[in-house]
Regions:
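Cytosolic-facing regulatory segments adjacent to core modules
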Residues: 1-69, 81, 131, 171-172
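Generic enzyme active-site microenvironment
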Residues: 5, 72, 113, 140
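Conserved H-loop
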Residues: 6-8, 108, 112-115
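Alpha-helical scaffold elements adjacent to nucleotide-binding pockets in ATP/GTP-utilizing enzyme cores
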Residues: 13-20, 98, 136, 140
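C-terminal regions of RecA-like/P-loop NTPase motor modules
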Residues: 26-28, 57-71, 101-106, 118-184
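Flexible beta-alpha connector loops of hexameric P-loop NTPases
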Residues: 27, 48-50, 80-93, 122-129
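A structural motif corresponding to the C-terminal end of an alpha-helix
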Residues: 41-48, 99-110, 140-142
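Helical hairpin unit composed of two closely spaced alpha helices linked by a short loop
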Residues: 69-112
Length: 184
């Protein structure tokens, strides 16, 4: 798995992954980092985290180099594009379509993560059009999954907002201090 974490540090992402595989909270992982890593390294060694914002060609080059089965891009609006004067929508459209084509041509899964636009965030609602550049994302994607919830409430809702080969659904989950989400 190649994880392009363009907002959070590699250590932060690594610690979160250790929390998930161990079921422990942040303090427990931080206090016993080496022991926990040694217990779970077989579940973590396949994850490569890159924190430098690449352009589209560099993403393709890294995929060719590592041959991952899954690529996660967190967030797509932080990917550099070649267009100097593109608006936000055009930039997201270029990135989303490029990554979609890469997924098809290289036979891999690419998960594109997008932030919610301000208006949807203020209204505390989530639908297919809530993401920044959502029309472009929806157009280039075979599946769109939304994760909705407020910081002060551990209950979150996962919704399949688009699914070209299956059903749509909503399910409630509870966030755990280990960053796991458990179905309620």
């Amino acid at each position: 798995c190649l994880y392009l974490s363009l907002e959070l540090s590699a250590w932060y992402m690594h610690r979160r992954n250790m929390q998930i595989v161990s079921g422990l909270d942040k303090e427990q992982v931080t206090d016993n980092y080496e022991e926990i890593y040694n217990l779970h390294k077989d579940k973590l060694n396949h994850i490569v985290i890159q924190t430098i914002a690449p352009n589209l060609d560099q993403i393709q080059q890294k995929i060719r180099e590592l041959q991952p089965a899954v690529v996660v891009v967190d967030y797509i609006d932080l990917i550099s594009t070649n267009g100097r004067y593109m608006g936000e929508y055009e930039q997201v459209k270029q990135v989303s379509h490029y990554l979609s084509n890469l997924a098809v041509n290289m036979d891999i899964i690419i998960i594109q993560i997008s932030q919610v636009s301000r208006s949807y965030s203020r209204e505390e609602r989530l639908d297919l059009y809530a993401g920044k550049g959502s029309g472009a994302i929806e157009n280039a994607s075979r599946k769109v999954i939304g994760l909705n919830g407020q910081a002060n409430n551990d209950t979150k809702e996962v919704s399949m907002l688009k699914n070209t080969d299956g059903e749509l659904f909503d399910t409630e989950l509870v966030w755990q201090p280990s960053f796991r989400l458990r179905r309620t």
